[in-house]
From Swiss-Prot:
UniProt source species: Mus musculus
Carbohydrate attachment residues: N28
Protein name: Lysophosphatidylcholine acyltransferase 2B
Sequence motif HXXXXD motif, residues: 142-147
Taxon lineage: Eukaryota, Metazoa, Chordata, Craniata, Vertebrata
Keyword Iron carried by entry: no
Domain-level remarks: The HXXXXD motif is essential for acyltransferase activity.
Gene: Lpcat2b
Gene Ontology molecular functions: 1-acylglycerophosphocholine O-acyltransferase activity; calcium ion binding
Length: 516
């Protein structure tokens, strides 16, 4: 890869370094090989020696650090309450300049002190851009809730956050101070609303705070950079990449859907002598005219820049892939290969997830009308209103388990239901049950239940007979929806899956990536 243009040498050292699109033309692909393992899993093995050290240090450090943090929270409470007075949850104009500087300076100091008490040693590289230079920060890789350090180091810019968090007593007040872009999970139009609000702010002549976005949309294990969502890139304005590194011999901070729990992450991290973290502000990237019109190209170029600086590969995994890991294990493919394959095929077909969401009920009607029968590629094409093409054949083959040229369209609809409604467990259960209640009498059989569970939740190798007897009783050969729902919501085997749905609803991707 060619080096950055030499004109940077003439820029005053106090200015923020800038990349424009011309200096990125040479970047066609990452310098590093593609990722193979799934970025959504974490298998950390602690040796006996590590466990012993952690327990000994934790016995001393955790009580001291927790006491210091609690004391700090007592100080933070009145500051946060006073700061949030008269601040609306959906601001229409920026807060006054004097108030912004006074409040944020106090909060930044207290938050930095809190991370210090928790044992974090923060190293900052590069120079933060001004709003005029870059209205948006994009930070990656996103691997833990401790990544909030980037928000603090950046001076508490606005963040994209769940509207529910604004109601949390202390955290909600602190979030309101940043004038966040709040996302309503229950609103099917949340993506469009969020995108429009970001666009309104960055294009406004008013002095809105800069916005910091984690474009990956979910936590990974930092082994690669997954597909970037397009919210930060759709406005077509300059962005400043912000890199996050945790150069520690033992990784205690990573929080993925099947790794350490949030409580375990906190306890393990507080039990370390210290935890290093590096926050690096990269040069501002100015998009070309082509990239302004094509946010996918813009996002991929920035992602490759960041990956090369981190010496990490990029991968076609996306947020939808992580949902598929939980919901579509029945694809009968090696997990990592199946995820990337689905993303690539979806990209080629230009699947519009907003449009799919609107047509779910229609798809369900088609599936129910088939009464459990198989459909071929022609009917599949007709249902999706897509021409028969090689990408469509590839998508079809993912669900054609025995390669006989037919699929059960109901399973495809259940998979789409999970992808489009990750936060609505009730909707998923209702749709699944409806599709397999062939005679519409409110009951399903053991065989139908087996297929439904595999398609809806990706739970392979279930002892279905035992499970069915637990749900229906020994003398019953069918299960009602009420019985199924009550069992599914209470059974421990499903609790983690439902919890994962809640964790993964943080955002959706606006589009799917091009290959790089």
């Amino acid at each position: 890869m060619a080096h950055q243009n030499q004109h940077q040498d003439t820029i005053d050292s106090t200015e923020v370094e800038v990349w424009d699109s011309r200096t990125a033309q040479e970047v066609n692909k990452s310098l590093y090989p593609p990722a193979v393992d799934s970025p959504f899993t974490l298998n950390t093995h602690l040796s006996a020696w590590r466990w012993a050290c952690t327990i000994i240090l934790g016995t001393v450090l955790v009580p001291v650090r927790v006491s210091c943090i609690v004391f700090l929270l007592i100080l933070l409470w009145p500051v946060a309450v006073l700061s949030a007075i008269n601040l609306p949850t959906q601001p229409t104009k920026p807060i006054r300049r004097w108030r912004k500087h006074l409040i944020k300076s106090a909060l930044v100091f207290l938050f930095r002190l809190g991370f210090f008490f928790a044992g974090f040693l923060v190293k900052v590289k590069g120079k933060k851009a001004t709003r005029e230079e870059a209205p948006i920060f994009v930070s990656a890789p996103h691997s833990t809730f401790f990544d909030a350090i980037a928000v603090v180091v950046a001076g508490l810019p606005s963040v994209v956050s769940d509207s529910q968090l604004a109601r949390v007593p202390l955290a909600g007040k602190c979030i309101l101070v940043t004038q966040p872009v709040l996302v309503k999970r229950e609103d099917p139009n949340s993506r469009k609303t969020t995108r429009n609000e970001i666009l309104r702010r960055v294009k406004s002549k008013m002095k809105w705070p800069q916005i910091l976005i984690f474009p990956e949309g979910l936590c990974t294990n930092r082994s690669c950079l997954v597909t970037f969502k397009l919210g930060a890139f759709s406005p077509g304005v300059p962005v400043q990449p912000v890199l996050l590194r945790y150069p520690n011999s033992l990784d205690t901070v990573t929080w993925t859907w099947n790794g350490f729990s949030g409580f375990q992450v906190c306890m393990l991290t507080l039990s370390q002598l210290f935890t290093r973290v590096e926050v690096e502000f990269m040069p501002v990237y100015i998009p070309s005219e082509e990239e302004k019109k094509d946010p996918i190209l813009f996002a991929n170029t920035v992602r490759i820049k960041m990956a090369n600086a981190l010496k990490l590969p990029v991968t076609d995994h996306s947020l939808e892939d992580c949902k598929l890991m939980i919901s579509a294990g029945a694809l009968q493919l090696p997990m990592e290969a199946g995820l990337v394959e689905f993303t690539k095929i979806s990209q080629k077909l230009k699947l519009d997830w907003d449009n799919i969401h609107k047509h779910l009920d229609q798809y369900a009607s088609f599936a129910v009308s088939s009464k459990g029968g198989k459909i071929g590629i022609e009917a599949f094409s007709r249902y999706l209103k897509l021409p028969i093409s090689e990408p469509l054949r590839q998508l079809f083959s993912l669900f054609d388990r025995n390669q006989d040229g037919t699929i059960d369209f109901r399973e495809y609809v259940i998979g789409l239901t999970v992808l489009c409604n990750p936060s609505n467990t009730e909707k998923i259960l209702q749709m699944s049950f409806k599709l397999f209640d062939l005679d519409e009498d409110g009951y399903v059989t053991e065989r139908e239940l087996t297929t439904m569970l595999q398609a809806a939740f990706g739970v392979p190798d279930l002892d279905v007979s035992t499970l069915f007897q637990q749900m229906a009783g020994k003398d019953s050969d069918q299960v009602s929806y009420r019985t199924f729902r009550r069992f599914a919501l209470k059974h421990p085997a499903y609790a983690k899956l439902f919890h994962s749905y809640i964790d993964l609803q943080a955002a959706y991707i606006y589009s799917l990536p091009r290959e790089v």
